[in-house]
């Protein structure tokens, strides 16, 4: 435990991650803005490693519920403790994570979540010896994928007679929310496994429904008697890039080719709108991952989620 002011944190973080930040074109001001955005107004607890004269490592715990903590903040620092490159990354990471375990146990938290980020590397290179040696278990791998639409050859699309395709605005937000809840509560995504109904509802709110209404590729699928079977939400990222924030199929109709049909129609509409790149995020163990890969999407980044539960913190 310890204290540190934001200016010291920014300077140290930029120093410790300078090659990485320079490669990404990230400057000191962006580091400051990023840390301020993630820290200000949030209940955070810092784990600090110091010598007598200077900061040599830090990590932060972010409470995400009354019983759950998340180690570190987000993509800016890649989900790992920030360590002075002159010191052993392995040793200091392990010390900081152990401090987090003890603090969590003393404050009655039941679960700690750790993230390990990777960019453009094989997952096998990114196993976290430190997390696993402290009793954490890998929960799932979430990946970001992208497809270069300039190289994509649109297939002939065959729409079954009983299926109709419409724009997102042709379904009510209430009906979309209800389908989202059913699809992911009953589906093969690990992320939603332990979420409460309220947390799933909040997640739907984060998907950008209102913005998706304006984009080509935000569509719905209806079946017999007009039953809502699936929908997609697409968001604008840059002038020539779009992002699939959500794509789901009713659980009764999964595995019947509707996901493939939806993706084909989405991509056709987006390409016709002059868009050059399409991105998305998914769990690597989901069936949808193989569908995306078969249509030219490739992994560009990812994160391994680790979890420690059940009062094991004070060992």
What are these regions (language model features)?
Residues 1-13, 164-180, 187:
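A short beta-loop-alpha structural element at the N-terminal edge
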Residues 14-34, 185-206:
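Conserved GNAT-fold acetyl-CoA-binding loop/helix
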Residues 20-21, 25, 29-106, 117, ...:
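Conserved donor-binding loop and adjoining core beta-sheet/short helix segment
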Residues 36-41, 208-215:
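Short loop/turn motifs at secondary-structure junctions and domain boundaries
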Residues 84-102, 249, 255-268, 272, ...:
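Conserved acetyl-CoA-binding loop-helix of GNAT-fold acetyltransferases
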Residues 85-162, 304-308:
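Acyl-donor-binding surface of acyltransferase catalytic domains
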Residues 112-116, 244, 278-282:
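Conserved hydrophobic beta-strand within the GNAT/NAT acetyltransferase core sheet
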Residues 128-154, 264-268, 272-315:
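Active-site/acyl-donor-binding loops of N-acyltransferases
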